[in-house]
Each structure stands twice: as structure tokens, then as C-alpha cells.
Amino acid sequence: MAESEAPIIEAGKVSKWLTDNGFDHEFLAPDHQGIEIIKGNRDFLIPLATALYAYGFNYLQCQCAYDAGPGEDLVSMYHLVKVSDDVEQPEEIRLKVFVPRDDPRLPSVYWIWKSADFQERESYDMYGIIYEGHPNLKRILMPEDWVGWPLRKDYISPEFYELQDAY
């Protein structure tokens, strides 16, 4: 193999199952712990998430977001776990969905995994990703009147923000 060629990484078990069942996605790679990472399309997030739930991923351990860089996409990431009684090391997968920063909309997975409630609210509060269909999408950490999305890489901090007296 030439030095410039990257090694071919074989798709993981879940990615193969999704492909066999006709679910559009892209296998990215396993992470440093060997957890399979897949990329989903925002237009098909709900069918893909429902398929993963049907596969057995019944627990959303973490939903978070990050900014891929100034001018780049925002990413909503879902860490899913297959929880059962007799498994010492449960199966895990990470699903990433990339959304353009000028139209950061995704369907909410709250109706599949209730644990997405506060996590999607935090991603909305910090990055401005709008989770359509979420039952209570509003700021959770920042004051309601805060302008902007503080964890975006292109965010400009206000020089002064007046804290209001709570008394």
C-alpha cells in the first residue's frame, strides 16, 4: 500500500444491518474505543433513529452538539446504547447528523428517546440547532433574552451583559 493511501475500514455490524435494511447512512469509522460512528441525513433522521431503536438501541446516553469550525456545519451527535439485563458490555453506536449553520434544523428524537429532552434544549441554547417537534424547546442555561449561540466558533461575546437583580 502506498503511503498516501488510507487503509480501508470495513463497515461495522450496525452499519451493515442498516444497509441490508435499506437505511441511508454513511459509515464514518470506529472511534478510539471501537464504538461505531455513522453519519445520517437530517431529512431521514427519524426513520434512521426509529430503525436504531428497533435494532435494540433503547437508551440515548448522550445527545450533544459541536461546531465543526467557522463557516462549517454544526453537528448533532447521539450516543446510543443497547441496554439489556444479561450483557456485561452493552453494544454502543454514535450517530452524527451535520446541519448547515444558516439552516440548523433537525427533527427532535424526543418522541423516540425521552432522555433527549434537556439535551436537545442544551444544544439549542448553545449552538442554535432547532429541534423541530420538541415539546419545550427553549433556553435552559442562558437567560431567555440572551442574543446568539455562545458555543459557536463564530460567536462574538458581548462586551457587557447586565445581570438583573433577582430580588
From Swiss-Prot:
Q: Thylakoid as a keyword?
A: yes
**Which reaction is catalysed here?**
a plastoquinone + NADH + (n+1) H(+)(in) = a plastoquinol + NAD(+) + n H(+)(out); a plastoquinone + NADPH + (n+1) H(+)(in) = a plastoquinol + NADP(+) + n H(+)(out)
Q: Tell me which UniProt keywords the record has, alphabetically.
A: Membrane, NAD, NADP, Plastoquinone, Quinone, Thylakoid, Translocase, Transport
| GO cellular component terms given for this protein | plasma membrane-derived thylakoid membrane
Q: What is its EC number?
A: 7.1.1.-
GO BP terms in the entry: photosynthesis, light reaction
| Species per Swiss-Prot/TrEMBL record | Trichodesmium erythraeum (strain IMS101)
What is the annotated localization of this protein? Cellular thylakoid membrane
Cite the Pfam families for this sequence: Complex1_30kDa
One example of the protein's molecular function in GO is: quinone binding
Q: Which family does it belong to?
A: Belongs to the complex I 30 kDa subunit family.
Q: How does it assemble?
A: NDH-1 can be composed of about 15 different subunits; different subcomplexes with different compositions have been identified which probably have different functions.
Q: Which Gene3D superfamilies match?
A: NADH:ubiquinone oxidoreductase, 30kDa subunit
Q: What is this protein called?
A: NAD(P)H-quinone oxidoreductase subunit J
* The keyword rRNA processing belongs to this UniProt entry's keyword annotation: no
Membrane topology label: Peripheral membrane protein
- Record's HAMAP family? NDH1_NuoC
Sum up the protein's function in the record's words: NDH-1 shuttles electrons from an unknown electron donor, via FMN and iron-sulfur (Fe-S) centers, to quinones in the respiratory and/or the photosynthetic chain. The immediate electron acceptor for the enzyme in this species is believed to be plastoquinone. Couples the redox reaction to proton translocation, and thus conserves the redox energy in a proton gradient. Cyanobacterial NDH-1 also plays a role in inorganic carbon-concentration.
